Curated annotation (Swiss-Prot):
The keyword Signal is annotated on this UniProt entry: yes
Listed Basic and acidic residues bias regions: 465-480
Residues making up the signal peptide according to the UniProt record: 1-16
Keyword tags: Signal
Species the sequence originates in: Human cytomegalovirus (strain Merlin) (HHV-5)
Protein name stated in the entry: Uncharacterized protein UL150
Positions with biased composition (Polar residues): 108-122, 432-446
Amino acid sequence: MLTLYLFTATCCFVCALPRQAQVDTAICHHTWPMCSDVPHPTSSAHNTALSSSHAISIEHRLLHSPSPPRENIRHSMRCRRRAIASSASTPVSHTQPLAANHRRSRITYATTDPTNSPTASPAKSDKLEADADPALHRRPDSLLRHLFQPCHAQRGTSNRATSQRASLNAVHHKLCGAMISSSWSTTCTPAIMDLPSLSVELSAGHKKKETPTEGGWGGEEGEDDVLATIRNTLSAPTSPAAATTHRLSFPEGSSFCLTAVSEYSQRLTSTAALTPPPPAVAAPFSFSSTVSETGAFPQSTAGRTRVDDTAVVTAGDPRSPVTHVTLLQIFRLRSSLLTSRSGDTLRGGEHEAIPKVASLFWTLLKATQTVEITHKTPSADSHRNPQKYTDRPQRLLLTALAIWQRTYNNTRADHAPQVRLLGNILTYRRPQTATASAKAHTQQQPEEPKGQQIWAQTAGQAAPHGDEPHSDGELRRESHSAPPTSRTLPDTILAVKRRSVAQRSHVRLDAKPGLNDRDGFRRRLLLPLSGYFRANELRNQQFMGYGTENGLKNTCLTRPLGAAGGVRETIGERQDRDVADSATQRVFHTLYAALQTVRVWYTALGTAWRTSGSRTRDSLFDGPRRRDRQAGRLRRLEL
């Protein structure tokens, strides 16, 4: 009976093998060890009833095991995770029947669902004739090659290059897949991406023919896997002037950063449609100013419903990458605008960048006017998964506008005319020359206190207003905060009498006749620890060693100022951290010393306790040598 059972089991086992193998190859490149590798149980163990029953149980487990053995679980998990990460929005369906002629199945994407595929999918009937026309199905091999890289690629051997390539893959996918599905949004997480070759061909003549593979990008066999070029022929806005094809490509490696700020997003209610002239006119830059008096940024939204939780973009072409590619280009231009550091004019004259931006905007607007945006309230659980870019729709155009509005205190603008220029571009004002706009700026805020300067000195420029920079009684607000909205907020947060520059640099505080020691002490504490004083004071000789080991740490300017103003930490913060740091060091030091003492004591006590049993009272109190001598005598006696 037993042998019969064993025999049937092995038969089932062998029959199960080929089917098993096929399924496996579908799942991943190399899978958990297949059953054929396991030494056959019956061969070694048919001697005793006990061992054979054991073998049966083993084999039984192998056949009916609900899950593969452990390391293989890990392996398949790894594969699955990588698959999920790489195909961002696209689920892989293994459920579709394998084509008859392929032994190794090809992974097919469920393209029927409109939300998943940003591009048109090849017709269903073609799926079976994949071998007949390889151009239709370029996906399986190349995609498999670089999306599901064989698992050893991810082991500890990775270096910077591989990880970078992985992240690039992710970025590409996210960019063309997930980000397209939510183009506009209230909150923007900065997405930093670097697409060395991003070329857009806009032409009214051809609508987009076939966009290579899913997600808007595909690796052909010959191409570099990671940076597969985005080569979509995009449908252009229907306008007479756009019939010319612009082909803009940018120098390799210029990286740019999109960050959008949602401050204004709640107040945007104006639904004025933008109708700028076609780019032929727009190039000399006469935009009709459509900015309403409230300063709200005009949005071309047909109707806004705040109920819907998903940002849906509906247009003739549902998720056309046009918008995105254009935006990316605009932002790349913007970054080059901001980084050119020449004083009053853009490097190479203004005429280069502007028409480009103008035409790009034209495309963008035409694309956007057909688009109706269901505007989304930040979803209820957005705090639970903040890392998804997709669930907070991003209104990218607001970015630059916000940069403009918050050019720190609106003062920095004098030093960065590029920013002002950009602001003009983005708000469709007719740009003035830099100097004129600066003058207008200064007249327009006459009541702004003199001292409200962005560390002009630190940045190395002379301060434009004020006779002597930062002179006596004047006190500046924190420079990084916006000027107070209501006039009720007092301009001076903290009033301290200041001396003229000459005195400040040479005289020690305590030597100042008006102050007694206590005052001097108080003031010296107050200066470095309160956030309201600028770096040039803290860099000053008398505070040098104060509050940190190295007084220069006191300068709160972490990074050098960029064109748009430095990225600064909160003013008090850097110092506070340093001071707190030294304090904690002190505490821990004391603690450590205490612990050492305790440890020593315990050792002593332990020794005493361990040795105490064998001692007599007099041997407790005399030296160890003598005791040893006694012990020796005793031992000798015993012998």
